[in-house]
Amino acid sequence: MRLLHTADWQIGRQYGRFAPEDALALAEARFSAVERLARLATEQAVAAVLVAGDVFDAQTVSDRTVRRLFNAMQGFSGPWILIPGNHDAALAESVWHRAKRLGAIPTHVEVLLEPGVYAFPQSGIAVLAAPLTQRQTSADLTAWFDNAESPEGLLRLGLAHGSVQGQLADDIDSPNPIAAERAARARLDYLALGDWHGLKRIDERTWYSGTPEQERFKNNGAGQALIVDFEQSGQPPRVTAHQVGEFQWRQWQETLGVDSDIDRLIERLEALPAPAVLALNLAGDTDLAGHQRLIQALAEAEARHRSVQYDLSALRLQPTDADVAALDADGYLGDVIDELRAQQSLHDDEASRDALVLLAGLLRERLPQAASSAEESALGMGTLEREDNA
């Protein structure tokens, strides 16, 4: 017997911190992740797909989004078994009721809106479902599992959405609690959980699958789904993680001091597998030449990856004498550069740093033009001399 366990699709999620083009691509990636889940389920010949809540990111997603989600599930013709989570709770009027009215839910998709034991004899499983009927509760909605009866001969599976107490980093006074020993107490063959967006093993029969498409800068194993194999009756299942997500999210903190630091950062950027979503915070010191190299490398990274966001506000610009000489700035402009250097050095003034960068860029643009004008002038002088000698 083989099952696929997934959760926290968050269909309809918005990405307000990103540029519109990137935000749209990240939202679309969540539909693509569901399509890949369907392919994985078909390739692995699973008996059913268990989806442990938060299928939708909000109750207010559009009708089109609802229809698109169920269309994305068509790649697997076996049973999909879903429960609502805190984002799409089974309220008196919910996104699930709207989906039913739209006729959007295919016949092979089962949405379990009420707690209970649901038998799927063709798949060989009985699902003890604990859907959320409100966004938050202080009660353990899986407590009734302990005394619930299920049909003989079927695997006894729990399906729930919440926070296993004492196991998660963010679970202090968290809503929707679940007892850590629930699988053992309730004699479950497996407890499929959602709500924690990373991959996490609670015990040999209790797992969080995490979200199939990463959406946060956390190194917690997001972007995967679980294939669960039951090989011997009464024995714990064999659980295998499969990569599903498209984008890897990375958050880097870098402190620069010497040229080799910039070299290493550029090498790291070039080695980052594409496509990625990168947030980069830089601190330390760099000269003008190093700053120019850094900006060029970031521009190239932006072209390779889905999103590159960087914060240079803590990076101090320390132009060297060689930097200033290369700009060929004298007179008033030279005095301005000296003043900006002093302001930026003494007061770590962000406005002075930005002005230095802008002025340096303008002067660099002027240098090729000046060289070109001098060359044209020299060519013209040579022509006049030839004409005079003719």
Task: Annotate each predicted stretch with a short phrase.
Residues 48, 58-207, 211-216:
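His/Asp/Glu-rich metal-coordinating catalytic cores
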Residues 35-45, 146-147, 259-272:
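A short, well-ordered alpha-helical element
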Residues 232-390:
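Accessory, non-catalytic peripheral segments of nucleic-acid enzymes
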Residues 45-46, 154, 187, 274-276, ...:
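Short loop/turn motifs at secondary-structure junctions
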Residues 1-68, 150, 353-356, 361, ...:
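N-terminal active-site segment of His-dependent metallophosphoesterases
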